[in-house]
């Protein structure tokens, strides 16, 4: 069999084991043709392979490229001053009353043109790529007007032309009520004007909504889901982060790809997600940064068979995090997730959360050849160590980059 590229003398995390674990292979090879894996597995079982380019991995570990399935990466402005204010005792309400909070990011994002927004976002993207990310989702939600939401989505797509990475854009117009607007009037505009325009221009694959007492009600979230479905867009939700609004169960009834945060999720929501195949996306960075104490119901989610993904939730207000490796450590330390669970959360299950489980997140024939090659002794090193980046090579669609 001929192939473009062959990586050999490697240890593999295939993420393709029947038991749902890492699918480790001690002496493995990965063969790629035209950006697609044609063989991944034990060297002893490989067919005869003739490669144009051969890489001796010298016993390094190869995993699928990491997937960050929940980010708000495209925004302008800096809210480090709010962090200082909170450390000095200011409340979120006091900061918001002084013009801070999400309104500050909305103001800065609206004021930035495409070039400025791109320049602000590229370093954050590069930080993710430096730790092995090959696919990421980017949400809008800091424009809150049709023009500015489209600007964010346009910049998200432009990022993918400047770096070797797959960007999955999500429309999050229902992130917050913009200053001076009335909630229901704004949601009507999201559903009647913004979603049709975003869909017509092909700017997003999915629609997200922040369903919470300080954002949008379940009834308003359902209105968004109906509009999304009518325009052929997938559904996601920020749910049960601060209280149980039963948003995850609602989203599951609409076949949502994922429900994210879910600290206050109840058993009915878990059951609904399990029945719908909706992925739980856990966001330990936000949990850590906001000093939350309400743990997501991980044992119950596992027992119900709900897939558990992880993400950085990169955003300026509650998770200014651009390190998937640190997010794994946070998930292990704060959520008591296993090493296997942390790694599957940023690979196989993250792919499912983006509707890409059929082509990303595993090493097997037919999958896209997105790889992360690591200088580590064991997979646990990816989760155990902090401030440590052992990435040797990132491979996107068969090309080392």
UniProtKB/Swiss-Prot annotation:
It comes from the Bacteria. Fe(3+) binds at residues 70, 72, 238, 313. It is an enzyme of class 3 (hydrolase). The keyword Ion transport does not apply. 4-imidazolone-5-propanoate binds at residues 79, 142, 175, 241, 318. Pathway: Amino-acid degradation; L-histidine degradation into L-glutamate; N-formimidoyl-L-glutamate from L-histidine: step 3/3. GO terms for molecular function: imidazolonepropionase activity; iron ion binding; zinc ion binding. Its cofactor is Zn(2+); Fe(3+). Its main location: cytoplasm. Pfam families: Amidohydro_1 (PF01979). N-formimidoyl-L-glutamate binds at residues 142, 315, 317. The keyword Transmembrane helix does not apply. GO terms for cellular component: cytoplasm. Belongs to the metallo-dependent hydrolases superfamily. HutI family. This is Imidazolonepropionase. It comes from Xanthomonas campestris pv. campestris (strain ATCC 33913 / DSM 3586 / NCPPB 528 / LMG 568 / P 25). The gene is hutI.
């Amino acid at each position: 069999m001929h192939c473009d590229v062959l990586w050999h003398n490697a240890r593999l995390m295939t993420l393709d084991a029947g038991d749902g674990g890492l699918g480790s292979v001690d002496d493995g090879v990965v063969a790629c043709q035209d950006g697609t894996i044609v063989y991944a597995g034990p060297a002893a079982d490989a067919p005869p392979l003739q490669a144009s380019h051969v890489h001796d991995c010298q016993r390094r570990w190869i995993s699928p490229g990491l997937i960050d399935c929940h980010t708000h990466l495209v925004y302008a402005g800096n809210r480090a001053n709010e962090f200082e204010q909170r450390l000095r005792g200011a409340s979120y309400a006091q900061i918001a009353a002084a013009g801070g909070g999400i309104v500050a990011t909305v103001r800065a994002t609206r004021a930035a043109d495409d070039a400025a927004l791109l320049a602000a976002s590229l370093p954050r993207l590069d930080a993710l790529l430096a730790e092995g990310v090959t696919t990421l989702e980017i949400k809008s939600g800091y424009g809150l007007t049709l023009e500015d939401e489209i600007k964010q989505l346009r910049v998200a797509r432009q990022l993918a032309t400047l770096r070797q990475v797959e960007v999955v854009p999500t429309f999050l117009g229902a992130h917050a009520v913009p200053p001076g607007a009335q909630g229901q009037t704004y949601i009507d505009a999201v559903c009647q004007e913004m979603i049709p325009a975003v869909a017509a221009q092909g700017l997003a694959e999915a629609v997200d909504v922040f369903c919470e007492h300080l954002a949008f009600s379940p009834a308003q979230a359902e209105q968004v889901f109906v509009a999304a479905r009518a325009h052929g867009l997938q559904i996601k939700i920020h749910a049960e982060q601060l209280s149980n609004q039963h948003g995850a169960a609602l989203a599951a009834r609409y076949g949502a790809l994922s429900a994210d945060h879910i600290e206050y999720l109840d058993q009915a929501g878990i059951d609904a997600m399990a029945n719908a195949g909706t992925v739980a996306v856990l966001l330990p960075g936000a949990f850590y940064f906001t000093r939350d104490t309400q743990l997501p119901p991980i044992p119950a989610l596992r027992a119900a068979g709900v897939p558990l993904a992880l993400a950085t939730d990169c955003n300026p207000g509650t998770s200014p995090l651009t390190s998937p490796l640190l997010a794994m450590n946070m998930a292990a330390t704060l959520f008591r997730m296993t090493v296997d669970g942390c790694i599957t959360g940023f690979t196989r299950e993250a792919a499912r959360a983006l509707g890409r489980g059929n082509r990303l997140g595993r090493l097997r024939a037919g999958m896209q050849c997105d790889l992360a090659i690591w200088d580590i002794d064991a997979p646990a090193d990816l989760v155990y160590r902090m401030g440590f980046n052992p990435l040797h090579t990132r491979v996107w669609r068969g090309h080392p980059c």
